[in-house]
Amino acid sequence: MRVGIGRTRPVVARWGMASGELKFGSARVLRLGGGLVSAHLLVDDAGLTLIDTGLWGVPGQVRRAVARLGRRREELREVVMTHGHLDHTGGAAEIQAWSGARVWVHAADRDHVEQAVEYRGLARGCGWLETAGRVVGRAQGRTYCPPVIGAELRDGDLLPVWGGLRVRHLPGHTPGHCALVAERREACGLVFSADSFASYGWSVHRPPWFLTRDRVEAERSLRALAELRPEAVLPSHYDRMDPALHARRLAKLVGGGA
């Protein structure tokens, strides 16, 4: 199976290495966050959808983006979290309180979002980092509070947002780690690959072992993602907002060339 963006090539307007926008007809993808970890605001005439909520700076970016677009906060109806690590959920409660959005996450990562997970073995390193992140957040006056989870992601489901987002459960990094595949005509096949891999000019790599719950399962999931043969990919950790570039990097990584 090969998924791609068809004949409609995205128009990329770069605002620098850590930000940007893709246009697919009247639909858009806005990158929020920064070079360390990104969230993505999906925009079309039907409403707004946020994929992941980054850390504590993202809620302010969301508010500014919505205002710049001339949209209302109530139009941000869905927040889809690819998995429950703190760098993807840190702003969820604040964004939910501001917009009233429903929050989606896979059932297997509910305890991650609620910060009730017990990290074991080598993955304890992730727990230590998240503890440090919460301490830094409190020092900045931003105590982590979990959002109210309103819906669960399931493998194969088609989310009724942005023309349709197909859920692909890719466990390993976390038990409930998911990717999302766009099915709208203009952007069919654009994959939001979450933390399946990181993509930078200086390094294209799998998530560090101490951030991954099950490395064997994560490798199976990475290969399952590559087997889709996507032509357009946006990871959560990347440099340039160039989906075709990240698709090529993914193929090279799994093929053994990176």
Residue ranges of predicted features:
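Core dinuclear metal-dependent hydrolase active-site scaffold
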Residues: 41-42, 152-185
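Active-site metal-binding motif and surrounding structural segment of the metallo-beta-lactamase
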Residues: 59-105, 109, 232
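Active-site environment of divalent metal-dependent phosphoester hydrolases
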Residues: 56-58, 84-89, 112-113, 175-177, ...
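Pre-active-site segment of Zn-dependent metallo-hydrolases
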Residues: 49-79, 123, 140-143, 148-149
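Metallo-beta-lactamase
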Residues: 110-168, 213, 217-229
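Divalent-metal (often Zn2+) His-rich catalytic cores of metallo-beta-lactamase-fold enzymes
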Residues: 97, 158, 181-182, 188-190, ...
